[in-house]
Amino acid sequence: MTRGEPLKIVPARFDDAPAMLAMQRLAFEPEARASRSSEIPPLQETVEGIREHIRTATVLKAMDGDRLLGSVRGILAGGTCLIRVLVVAPDAQGRGLGAALLAAIEDAHPRIERFELTTNMAMVGNVRFYLRHGYEMVEQLQHSAAIRLAFMRKIARR
C-alpha cells in the first residue's frame, strides 16, 4: 500500500465499473481453473451489470491512493443482505483487505437481520475465510455440472 496514505473503503461510482470488471476477471481466474469451468458468474459479468449494481445496491471499493484493490456488493432482499462478488486484486490478497471489505459491507447495513452469500466449494480457502468471519454453512447447491456452491449465512449481531 502507498506510504502515508491509508486504505480507504468508499462507495463505488459508475466510472469504476471497467476497472472492477478487469480486477474481478483476474481474481476469479484461479476459481475457474479449480472448477475446470469458465461458468463462474463473476467471469460472465459485464460493465453494464456492475453499473446496475452500483445503481441499485451497496457497492464498496477498497482504494490505495488511486489504485483499486478490491470491491464487494450488498444487495438487500427484505431483512437479508446478499453479499456478492467480494473480490481482492490478486497481488493484494492475504493482507486483510477481504476481511475489511466484508466488515464494511456488514457495517453499511446496520438494520439487517442476516447476511447470506454463496462461494465455490472448490475454493476451500474462501469457505474457511467466511467460516472464520462468523458465517455458517447452510447447504451445498449444484450451480452447474462443474460448480458446487456453499450457501452460507450469518445472523447479524445487533
How would you name each of these model-derived features?
Residues 8-22:
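A short beta-loop-alpha structural element at the N-terminal edge
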Residues 110, 131-140:
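Conserved acetyl-CoA-binding loop of GNAT-fold acetyltransferases
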Residues 21-50:
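Conserved GNAT-fold acetyl-CoA-binding loop/helix
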Residues 61, 67-75, 82-87:
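Conserved beta-strand in the GNAT
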Residues 109-120:
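Conserved GNAT acetyl-CoA-binding A-motif
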Residues 48-61:
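A short helix-loop-beta-strand connector motif used in the catalytic cores of GNAT acetyltransferases and
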Residues 88, 94-107, 128, 132:
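Conserved acetyl-CoA-binding loop-helix of GNAT-fold acetyltransferases
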